[in-house]
Amino acid sequence: MAKIVKVIGREIIDSRGNPTVEAEVHLEGGFVGLAAAPSGASTGSREALELRDGDKARFLGKGVLKAVAAVNNEIAQALVGKDATNQAEIDQIMIDLDGTENKSKFGANAILAVSLANAKAAAAAKGMPLFAWIAELNGTPGQYSMPLPMMNIINGGEHADNNVDIQEFMIQPVGAKTLKEALRIGAEVFHNLAKVLKGKGLSTAVGDEGGFAPNLESNAAALACIKEAVEKAGYVLGKDVTLAMDCASSEFYNKENGMYEMKGEGKSFTSQEFTHYLEELCKEYPIVSIEDGQDESDWEGFAYQTKVLGDKVQLVGDDLFVTNTKILKEGIEKGIANSILIKFNQIGSLTETLAAIKMAKDAGYTAVISHRSGETEDATIADLAVGTAAGQIKTGSMSRSDRIAKYNQLIRIEEALGDKAPFLGLKAVKGQA
C-alpha cells in the first residue's frame, strides 16, 4: 500500500500572471507527487467550476486561496491514510466530499491538482514513469503511441489582442516519421512564419499559446500566411503539413439573433452558412480538423455540420462536450461531431478524464489531448497523451516555455519508449486513416 501521509496546497502563478493551485501528495517511503491546475480563457459554460476568491484587492479577484484552503484542510484530512494507487477511490472521495454537480465547493482547480499529484506520487511509489502508470489506470498497460502535435502558430479570438475572429490556426507536421521530427518541422515553419509576417509589416508578438497574433484582413489571410511559411520552410502543404482550426464559435455567436458575427471580417452567418464558409476554406486549404465549428448550444447546427463535413474533416467538440461523459454520450447518440477535446480541468479529475477518453474511443471518436491558454511548467498532458495512446495533442506553438515543457517531455518519452510508441501522424486524425 502506498499510503498518503500528507497533502499540501499552495497558490502559484500561471503563464498569464494569474494564480492557480499547486498540490503536493506525500506518501510513506518519501515518494512525492507535484501537480498544478491549468486555466482557460474561452471556456464552455458547462465546465466544472474553477474557484476564484473574488477579492478585488488581491490579483484583481483571481486569487485561489479558498481552493488552496480546501486542499490543506478538508481534502487533506479525507485523503491521509488512503492508498494513492487506488486513483478512482481518491478521486471519488474528493468528488463526494465536494458534493456539487460542478465541483463548485472546493473548485475543480483544487480537486484536479490533488488528483494529478496523487497519480504522480503513485507512479513514483510503483517505480514507473507517469505515462506507464496512466496506461495501467486506463486498463491498457504497455499500449502507447506518440501524439501528432497540433501547433497553434497564429492566435486570434480570446487568445490574442487582434482582429482575427477564429481563435487558433494550427499546423500538423504529418510528414514526420517521429515526434521529434514533427517538432523540428513545426519549429522551422514557425520561424519562417515570423519572416513572412515581418515581410508584410505585420506584428510578430505572440498570444497566450505562443503563436503569432497579427492583425489580418481575414481568416483566409491567416491560412495564406501559413501556406507561404510552409513553402518557405521547404515543405509541401497537404503532404508534409496539414492544417487545423479552432473556431471557438461560441465567442462570436450572437444568441439573440442566432448569427455568427465575425467582426474582424465584417461578416455575419446563419448556422448553416457558417458551415459552408468553413467548407469553402477546406476546399482551398488542406484543413483536416475543425474544433467548435458551431456554438456549444447549437446542436442542430453541429448535426448539420457533421452531415456536411464529418466524413472528410475531424470535427472536435471542446466547449461542446467539456470532457464530460454525460454530454459526450448524448453527442454520440445524436451523431454530433466525431472527436472530443480532452482538458483535465473541464471535468476536474484524472479518473473522469480517462472515462471520457475511453467513451470517445469506444464510439469511434478520436480524443485530442489539450492544454489551456493559462498553463504552468506542469507537463502531465504529455504523459496522458502517450499513456492513453490518444494520437493527437494540442499544446501550443514553438515559443513560451509553458508550451515547450510539454514538447520536451514528449521528446524524453519517445526516447525512452522507442518503437514501443509509434508515431501515427495523419492516421491519428478522424477521417484521414
Swiss-Prot record:
SUPFAM superfamilies: Enolase C-terminal domain-like, Enolase N-terminal domain-like
Domain of life: Bacteria
Keyword flag Transport: no
Cofactor: Mg(2+)
Gene3D superfamilies listed in its UniProt record: Enolase-like C-terminal domain, Enolase-like, N-terminal domain
GO biological process, one term: glycolytic process
GO cellular component, one term: cell surface
EC number: 4.2.1.11
Pathway(s) annotated for this protein in UniProt: Carbohydrate degradation; glycolysis; pyruvate from D-glyceraldehyde 3-phosphate: step 4/5
GO molecular-function terms, A-Z: magnesium ion binding; phosphopyruvate hydratase activity
Function field: Catalyzes the reversible conversion of 2-phosphoglycerate (2-PG) into phosphoenolpyruvate (PEP). It is essential for the degradation of carbohydrates via glycolysis.
Protein name: Enolase
Organism ancestry: Bacteria, Pseudomonadati, Pseudomonadota, Gammaproteobacteria, Pasteurellales
